[in-house]
Amino acid sequence: MDNELLSVRELEPSEHPMVSAWARAHGCGKFDPRLLPANRFFAVCVDGNPVMVAALHFLVGVGVAMLDHSFSVPGLSLRNARRASAALVDVASDIAAQNNCGVLQMFVPSGIARVAKTLGFQEQDNNLHFMTKQCL
Protein backbone atom coordinates (compact mmCIF):
# COMPACT_ATOMS: atom_id res chain seq x y z
CA MET A 1 0.00 0.00 0.00
CA ASP A 2 2.99 2.31 0.46
CA ASN A 3 3.03 3.63 -3.10
CA GLU A 4 -0.53 2.84 -4.10
CA LEU A 5 -3.10 5.53 -4.73
CA LEU A 6 -5.69 5.95 -2.00
CA SER A 7 -9.30 6.86 -2.71
CA VAL A 8 -12.06 7.88 -0.32
CA ARG A 9 -15.70 7.02 -0.92
CA GLU A 10 -18.91 6.70 1.03
CA LEU A 11 -19.37 3.34 2.72
CA GLU A 12 -22.27 1.19 1.58
CA PRO A 13 -24.71 -0.27 4.15
CA SER A 14 -23.84 -3.72 2.80
CA GLU A 15 -20.31 -3.15 4.17
CA HIS A 16 -21.45 -2.76 7.80
CA PRO A 17 -20.71 -6.44 8.61
CA MET A 18 -17.11 -5.84 7.50
CA VAL A 19 -16.88 -2.86 9.88
CA SER A 20 -18.36 -4.98 12.65
CA ALA A 21 -15.68 -7.64 12.09
CA TRP A 22 -12.95 -4.97 12.16
CA ALA A 23 -14.35 -3.51 15.39
CA ARG A 24 -14.35 -6.95 17.05
CA ALA A 25 -10.82 -7.64 15.83
CA HIS A 26 -9.67 -4.39 17.47
CA GLY A 27 -11.40 -5.34 20.75
CA CYS A 28 -14.13 -2.72 20.40
CA GLY A 29 -17.06 -5.07 20.84
CA LYS A 30 -20.16 -5.07 18.70
CA PHE A 31 -20.48 -2.42 16.00
CA ASP A 32 -24.07 -1.21 15.83
CA PRO A 33 -24.83 0.64 12.56
CA ARG A 34 -27.93 2.15 14.21
CA LEU A 35 -25.51 4.35 16.19
CA LEU A 36 -24.06 5.87 13.03
CA PRO A 37 -24.70 9.54 12.40
CA ALA A 38 -27.02 10.38 9.56
CA ASN A 39 -24.47 12.48 7.66
CA ARG A 40 -21.70 10.41 6.07
CA PHE A 41 -19.71 7.23 6.62
CA PHE A 42 -16.48 6.98 4.62
CA ALA A 43 -14.04 4.31 3.54
CA VAL A 44 -10.42 4.87 2.55
CA CYS A 45 -9.67 2.36 -0.20
CA VAL A 46 -6.70 0.85 -1.99
CA ASP A 47 -7.65 -0.61 -5.37
CA GLY A 48 -11.31 -0.25 -4.37
CA ASN A 49 -10.88 -2.27 -1.18
CA PRO A 50 -11.54 -0.50 2.14
CA VAL A 51 -8.63 -0.30 4.58
CA MET A 52 -10.09 2.28 7.02
CA VAL A 53 -13.53 3.69 7.77
CA ALA A 54 -14.93 6.59 9.80
CA ALA A 55 -18.20 8.46 10.25
CA LEU A 56 -18.51 12.23 9.88
CA HIS A 57 -21.40 14.12 11.38
CA PHE A 58 -22.21 17.74 12.12
CA LEU A 59 -23.31 19.24 15.42
CA VAL A 60 -26.20 21.44 14.36
CA GLY A 61 -25.81 25.16 14.88
CA VAL A 62 -22.35 25.14 16.49
CA GLY A 63 -19.96 24.82 13.54
CA VAL A 64 -18.40 21.59 14.76
CA ALA A 65 -17.99 18.31 12.87
CA MET A 66 -17.26 15.01 14.62
CA LEU A 67 -15.20 12.20 13.12
CA ASP A 68 -15.84 8.89 14.86
CA HIS A 69 -16.55 5.16 14.46
CA SER A 70 -13.09 4.86 12.91
CA PHE A 71 -11.67 1.38 12.34
CA SER A 72 -8.92 -0.03 10.14
CA VAL A 73 -8.60 -3.40 8.52
CA PRO A 74 -6.90 -5.71 11.05
CA GLY A 75 -3.17 -6.00 10.45
CA LEU A 76 -2.80 -2.63 8.72
CA SER A 77 0.73 -1.38 9.38
CA LEU A 78 1.24 1.82 11.37
CA ARG A 79 2.76 3.47 8.31
CA ASN A 80 -0.24 2.60 6.15
CA ALA A 81 -2.69 3.52 8.92
CA ARG A 82 -1.08 6.96 9.10
CA ARG A 83 -1.38 7.34 5.35
CA ALA A 84 -5.04 6.26 5.34
CA SER A 85 -5.78 8.50 8.34
CA ALA A 86 -4.29 11.50 6.55
CA ALA A 87 -6.50 10.86 3.50
CA LEU A 88 -9.57 10.47 5.69
CA VAL A 89 -8.86 13.63 7.69
CA ASP A 90 -8.23 15.63 4.49
CA VAL A 91 -11.61 14.64 3.04
CA ALA A 92 -13.43 15.11 6.37
CA SER A 93 -11.85 18.56 6.84
CA ASP A 94 -12.90 19.65 3.34
CA ILE A 95 -16.48 18.45 3.82
CA ALA A 96 -16.65 20.03 7.28
CA ALA A 97 -15.51 23.37 5.86
CA GLN A 98 -18.06 23.11 3.01
CA ASN A 99 -20.74 22.71 5.71
CA ASN A 100 -19.56 25.78 7.68
CA CYS A 101 -17.88 23.73 10.39
CA GLY A 102 -14.74 25.45 11.56
CA VAL A 103 -13.72 22.66 13.94
CA LEU A 104 -13.25 18.91 13.42
CA GLN A 105 -13.24 16.86 16.64
CA MET A 106 -12.83 13.18 17.52
CA PHE A 107 -12.49 11.00 20.60
CA VAL A 108 -9.66 8.49 20.11
CA PRO A 109 -7.39 6.11 22.05
CA SER A 110 -3.89 7.29 22.97
CA GLY A 111 -2.15 5.64 20.02
CA ILE A 112 -4.42 7.31 17.50
CA ALA A 113 -4.11 10.62 19.37
CA ARG A 114 -0.38 10.61 18.63
CA VAL A 115 -1.10 10.18 14.91
CA ALA A 116 -3.88 12.80 15.04
CA LYS A 117 -1.44 15.38 16.40
CA THR A 118 0.70 14.91 13.28
CA LEU A 119 -2.44 15.68 11.21
CA GLY A 120 -3.06 19.03 12.92
CA PHE A 121 -5.32 17.98 15.82
CA GLN A 122 -4.74 19.42 19.28
CA GLU A 123 -5.41 17.49 22.46
CA GLN A 124 -8.09 19.18 24.57
CA ASP A 125 -8.33 16.87 27.57
CA ASN A 126 -6.33 13.72 28.21
CA ASN A 127 -8.93 12.25 30.55
CA LEU A 128 -11.91 11.82 28.20
CA HIS A 129 -13.67 8.51 27.63
CA PHE A 130 -16.17 7.61 24.93
CA MET A 131 -19.32 6.37 26.69
CA THR A 132 -22.64 4.99 25.40
CA LYS A 133 -25.84 4.01 27.21
CA GLN A 134 -28.68 1.95 25.81
CA CYS A 135 -32.01 3.72 26.34
CA LEU A 136 -34.35 1.35 24.47
Give short role names for the model-derived ranges.
Residues 2-6, 44-47, 86-90, 105:
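Generic alpha-helical hydrophobic packing signal
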Residues 32-35, 79-81, 90-94, 129-133:
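Glycine-rich loops and low-complexity Gly/Arg-rich segments
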Residues 50, 54-56, 81-83, 90, ...:
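Short, structured secondary-structure boundary patches
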Residues 65-120:
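Acyl-donor binding region in acyl/amide transferases
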